Design a protein with these regions (language model features):
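Interfacial juxtamembrane loops and adjacent helix segments
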Residues: 53-107
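Hydrophobic, aromatic-rich transmembrane alpha-helices
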Residues: 297-324, 328-332
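Membrane-interface alpha helices of multi-pass inner-membrane proteins
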Residues: 200-214, 220-228, 246, 332
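Specific aromatic-rich, kink-prone transmembrane helix
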Residues: 146, 182-202, 352-356
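Transmembrane-helix signature of polytopic, membrane-embedded enzymes
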Residues: 130, 147-168, 184-185, 201
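Loop-to-helix entry region of an early transmembrane alpha helix in multi-pass inner-membrane enzymes
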Residues: 100-112, 116, 124-142
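Perimembrane helix-loop-helix junctions
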Residues: 3-5, 191, 195, 218-245
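Short acidic/glycine- and proline-prone juxtamembrane loop motifs at membrane-interface regions
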Residues: 172-182, 342-343
């Protein structure tokens, strides 16, 4: 009996060819079309700020890049000229006042490795705004390669993996304006290396992931605790690495950002005009309100379907149990700490669950003696 995909990673059967073609087509599509949200100008501003210190020059270069490179349909929204809302008035004020614009940059500078990735792509000759699409698309290609490799290692169905590439959750990462795709690439690569390459490589990638998104330090700590408990990492080494993981977001927030209280207040309560002089206020009552809103958003998303797949994969694919458990714990902890539910924040959970489901599909097919 022959199954697709076969176990050998270099044996390009029909499913592998389809997967490769689909990856290339989607990669080109994601290079051409990015969401370009209102965060675009702040990320571009942070790249400019690596080379220029004058707030006026930073504002001018950032908005010039947006108006000349971004699709015409999204430019009015980024500038705040399309609506009469409070949020739009803030965007207009940022555009008009370079010093006010500069006050918003620290909210986005706390993803330093992502900013450096944009800068590297820009130095290669790509426009400032287009660099965002390139980093997201390249991250997609990396994730697609890891998914294919992992599914093969598990003896899973590459046909099912083809479906994964077409999901809205994958598109959100591949077309997103921000570090989410790159963040999941580091986390997924680290997780895969822990089990199927070398733990040292996996730990290195996980440590680096915190410089893409600081909250990834939570996942790194969970992985280090697992390795220490399994005897794969000496206790003293685990303690040192956990300390580094914990100190990383502290160091990032010390040199950039306004702190957690300001972030919570900015996200869940206010749209402040001048965050540099804004006094944040966030109470327990505010947190509970945000938590209830986050739960409602989660219940109206695809999360429930993925949780069912997560439970199924946990039961049917023994080799994926610890990766699934670590991703589940990480996602739960992240939601409790920061209950702003957006699918892009939980990309790792979605992808690892889907990889487990690809293996579960093949295991059920094999148990019923069906050739795929």
């Amino acid at each position: 009996m022959v199954y697709f995909p076969v176990a050998h990673p270099y044996d390009m059967k029909a499913s592998g060819v389809v997967y490769l073609v689909l990856t290339v087509v989607l990669f080109i599509h994601f290079l051409r079309y990015n969401n370009y949200t209102t965060d675009t100008v702040e990320f571009v501003g942070n790249v400019v700020a690596l080379h220029v210190s004058d707030p006026v020059a930073i504002r001018d270069l950032a908005y010039r890049a947006v108006t000349t490179e971004a699709p015409a349909m999204v430019v009015p929204h980024i500038l705040g000229t399309d609506l009469a809302t409070e949020e739009a008035s803030v965007r207009r004020a940022k555009h008009a006042d370079p010093y006010r614009f500069a006050q918003f940059l620290p909210y986005f500078s706390v993803k330093p490795l992502y900013i450096e990735a944009l800068n590297l792509v820009h130095k290669a000759g790509v426009g400032l705004v287009r660099s965002i699409a390139v980093v997201s698309a390249v991250s997609f290609a990396g994730m697609a390669a890891l998914i294919y490799w992992w599914v093969l290692k598990l003896g899973g169905s590459v046909w099912a993996a083809c479906v994964l590439l077409l999901t809205p959750e994958m598109s959100a990462l591949a077309q997103g304006t921000g570090p989410d795709g790159l963040s999941v690439l580091f986390l997924l690569g680290g997780l895969f290396c822990l089990w199927d390459v070398r733990p040292s490589v996996g730990v290195t990638l996980l440590l680096l992931s915190a410089w893409v998104r600081p909250e990834n330090a939570i996942f790194c700590i969970l992985a280090l605790l697992y390795l220490a408990a399994k005897g794969q990492l000496r206790v003293w080494m685990a303690v040192v690495l956990i300390g580094i993981s914990a100190l990383t977001p502290m160091a990032i927030n010390h040199f950039g950002g306004y702190g957690w209280k300001a972030l919570y207040s900015h996200t869940f309560k206010f749209t402040e005009m001048e965050p540099g002089i804004f006094v944040p206020a966030f109470t327990v009552s505010d947190y509970l309100h945000a938590l209830r809103s986050g739960v409602r958003e989660a219940l109206h998303s695809s999360l429930i379907a993925y949780l069912l797949l997560w439970i199924t994969s946990l039961r049917l694919v023994p080799r994926m149990r610890w990766p699934l458990l670590l991703c589940g714990l990480f996602s739960a902890a992240k939601f409790v700490i920061y209950p702003n539910f957006e699918p892009r924040y939980y990309g790792l959970l979605y992808l690892v669950t889907a990889i487990g489901a690809c293996a579960a599909v093949q295991s059920k097919v094999a148990s019923h003696g069906v050739t795929t």
